Amino acid sequence: VAHLDDQGGNKVRLKWFGSNTNLHSVWDSKLIEYKGFSYTEYTSYLHDVYGCQRKTILRMSEEETLLYTYHVTDAIYQYHSTWSGNTYHYAYQWVETAEYQMYMAGIRLAKHLNDLF
């Protein structure tokens, strides 16, 4: 769920801890790298924090998932339009949302793969 006019955040320029980047990159990798976890550590962390929501995620329809993501995307763009440029505040504000989105995507992908095989 993205804004076509800015190519999903690729045209939205910003500074992340002093380095030039774009909004898409922040959400693709920078928020994840912010915690400094290895992949194994992050997997365990996400399971520990969000595992209790697994059944709820699996019950969500494709439409509900899309609508949830649409609202998250809308909130990100609204926040960005008034953002002061403080990277620490941005990370504090959005890292949990990014983590939940990752967890939700992983659970839904696993479900689809299990359904296929």
Identify what each model region corresponds to.
Residues H3-F117:
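C-terminal accessory segments of proteins
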